[in-house]
Amino acid sequence: MFSALAYYLLIYPASLLPLRLMYFFTDFFYLLLISILPYRRKVVRKNLKNSFPEKSEKERRKIERKFYRHLTDLLAEGAKNLSISKKNLKKRFRVENPEVMEELYKKKKSVLLVSGHYNNWEWMITSQNLLFPHQAVGIGMPLSNGFWDKKLNERRARFGMKIIHSKITHDFFKKNKDIIATLVLADQSPGDSNRCYWTSFLNQKTGVLFGPEMLANEYDQAVVYFNIKKVRRGYYSIHLHEITDNPSQLTYGQITEKHTQLLEETIKEEPAFWLWSHKRWKRQVPENLDALRESHEKKFNERFR
C-alpha cells in the first residue's frame, strides 16, 4: 500500500517535471549524501582504495565526490525514466556506431549485449528497442517488492523490450524465433563462488558471471560490449565493440576475459560513473581455484568443443 501511494502521489508526478528542475532537487540531496547521510561510504572508499592503490587519498576522494554527484543524477534520471517520451529519450541517448548491430542483423545473428552498471544503464534498458533492429530482451531477477517489480518492468518494456525471468532464460531461447539482442549487466557479484569465472579485475581477484559466454556458445549468438559515455548532464552516447560473431572459434574464457577487460578500461577512463556503492567483491576466492578452473574448462570443452 505504501509503495503504491509513494508511486502515484510522489514519484510518478515528480517524473513529469522537467529534468533540469529534478536536478535542482537532487543537487540538494547530493549535499546531504556527502555530509549528513553518507550512503555506503565505507563500501565506496574500500572499493576505490582496493581498485586504485596507486592513486593518492586526495585523488580517490575526488572520484568519490564525483560518484555521489553522478549517483544523485541517476536518481533524477531514473525517476524521469518512468514517463520520458520516446522522442526525448532518443534525443538524449544515441549510438555512435549503429552499423555494428545493423550488420549482425543483416546476417540474422542474435546478439548478447554485455556491459556493467556504468553510467545510465536504465536508459539503455528502456531505449534498446528504439536503438537497434534486433528485438530487445532483458534478463532479470524479480524484486522482493511485487509492486515495484511490476511497475519498473512495465516502464522498461513500454518501448518494446521483452523482460524475462532468469530462471526461464533457456526455455525462452529454445523457443525464440526472432533475431534478438539480450542485454546482460555482467558485473554483479556472482551467487556462487564455485560456479563463476575467476579473473583479475580492477587490481583484485574477481568472480565474474559466466552466463554470457555459456549462452553465446549454447545458442550461437554474437557478443557485443557496449560502453555508455556521459556526453553531458542528461545526455549519453553508446559505443559498441564486437567481441565475436562466432563464439565457437574462441577458447574457454576468452569472451568473459574480453568483456571484463573492456569494462575495466571503461571504468579507468572515467572512474566516477561506475556503481562503487555495490558490494562487488563480497565473495571469497575459492581455495582450490586452479583445480576448479580446470574442472570448469573440461566441462565447457566437453559440452561445446
Describe each region flagged by the PLM.
Residues 60, 144, 148, 255:
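Hydrophobic (often cysteine-bearing) scaffold residues that line and stabilize catalytic clefts
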Residues 62-65, 103-105, 130, 170-305:
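Non-catalytic C-terminal accessory region of glycerolipid acyltransferases
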Residues 98, 139-141, 164-167, 241-243, ...:
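Conserved beta-strand termini and adjacent loop/short-helix elements that scaffold enzyme active sites
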Residues 17, 36-37, 51-53, 132, ...:
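A broad structural signal for alpha-helix termini and local helix breaks/kinks
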Residues 91-94, 118, 145, 165-166, ...:
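A conditional alpha-helix N-cap/helix-loop micro-motif detector
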Residues 107-167, 191-197:
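Catalytic core of membrane glycerolipid acyltransferases/transacylases, capturing the structured
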Residues 1-115, 150-155, 160, 304-305:
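Membrane-anchoring hydrophobic helices of lipid-metabolizing enzymes
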Residues 97, 121, 148, 165-169, ...:
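Amphipathic coiled-coil/heptad-repeat helices and related helical stalk/stem segments
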